[in-house]
Amino acid sequence: MKKYGTSYGMACDNSFRKEGTPLENGMQKRYGLFTAISMVVGIVIGSGIFFKATKVLANNNGDMGRSLLTVAIVGAIMLICSFVFANLASRYEKVNGVVDYAEAALGRGYAYYVAWFMTLIYYPTLVSCLAWITAQYAGILFGFPITGMTHFWIGLAILVGDGLINAYAPKLAGKLQVSTTAIKLVPLVLMAVVGTIVGLSNGLTVQAFTAASQQIASQGSGLMGAIVAFAFAYEGWIIATSINSELKDAKKNLPLALSLGALIVVAIYMAYFVGLTGTMTTADMMAAGDLLPEKAFGNLFGSAAGTVVFVFIVISCLGTTNGLMMGAARGAYSLGVRNEGIAPRFFAKVDQKTGMATNSAWFGIIICTLWYLYWHFFFIHGMGPSFFNWEPDELPIITLYAAYIPMFISLMVNAREEKPFKRFILPTAAILGCCFMVYCAFAAYRIQALYYLGFFVVVMLIGAVVRSTNNKKAKV
């Protein structure tokens, strides 16, 4: 096996085990390439493409060209980062992809804090957001209020239900991921193809790209806000690496899944935005708000189709929530199996019947529920101080992309056997992309970004105390 220098030669014994055999930690090789691709595509393509489209247009003052540029910029950053991680995935396999790569690059300490952040902030904020949004679209579909307690309880039921499936039926969770991914692509491909054809015929597509906005020149920060907003629509692809210890032939299949999945997502997003231009003017798109998918498909295929597409959207959101929960359910396990975090032996246990870390899954359900309460009562309804009302679906990208940078630098330093393109050019481009994303987040949110960082520091300090306590116990 080709190895890096001292840092990247840390592959554990699990990397050499034959396919189909259980790892020493007990997790089974249960997933194949299509499940991994479905993780990437299915997690990324969810609610974001539907409910962030109007926000992107609004930030760009209705300019479709700039909106498409937004989609392309964030997509390019995702592609470059996924290619770099695909390179890492072909060389290192242990328990939880991104945490494994952090450990290989910078040691156990850095890996611990990455895993702590992913487990307590990144996974659960996305899960809670998607559960709430899924309930919102279900409310639009079935006609119940989308801001009241009915909405709240449906979202919570979706969250807990997904968690229980992942805890007690992990194979079913994988099958759901594959099936919902196939279903969610149907409306997007239809809009991309039919919408573009209709738009070129009725002139709306040409109009969307030629009509100049009167406000563009006076609002230079619009693109930054649009980039941060649409970053959510691309988020979650890294979670596919959380199943690498359960993926058959992971060193071959995970790189393929990351690369192919990312390409599929970017192509579909770009085509979907172009397709939207054939259904209505950009001003009407912005005015439609969360009802944009229903109105766009209604204009294209008739009012009945507008209703049917909401069924697809709800299924799409359910699939994304499931994929995110697959990562959240394994967060505490990725710490416990390294003898790190809270009660490591308890969370490292794997159920012999299901081959799943059930205790870890329950921890994920509880943390996701706490974040769901925050999302509903603090962020949506503002029932807290202003410094604790930052947007949880967008701001964690600051620390996520910042965490990638040291890993990419380590790759450049230690990957001596790699060709210059993989060793220097791709990681450098990825670092620049990460820095750009962090800058955009600060430019768009300013004081709210600082509030989030304050919270992040507190969570990391708690993690430091937990790690210090564990280390002292180990020495006794």
Name each model feature, range by range.
Residues 100-103, 107, 140-144, 259-322, ...:
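TM-loop-TM module centered on a large, flexible mid-protein loop between adjacent transmembrane helices
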Residues 49-56, 165-171, 304-305, 367-390, ...:
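Transmembrane helix-loop junctions in multi-pass membrane proteins
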Residues 3, 25-29, 68, 145-151, ...:
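Helix-loop-helix junctions that connect adjacent transmembrane segments
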Residues 28-34, 53-150, 154, 261-264, ...:
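Extracellular loop-to-transmembrane helix junctions
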Residues 118-131, 239-246, 306-344, 390-394, ...:
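Membrane-helix boundary/coupling elements in multi-pass transport proteins
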Residues 199, 396-414, 420-476:
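A generic transmembrane alpha-helix motif of multi-pass inner-membrane proteins
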Residues 12, 150-204, 258-263, 399-402, ...:
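Membrane-interface loop-to-helix entry segments
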Residues 2-66, 78-79, 83, 94-95, ...:
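Membrane-interface "cap" regions at the ends of multi-pass membrane proteins
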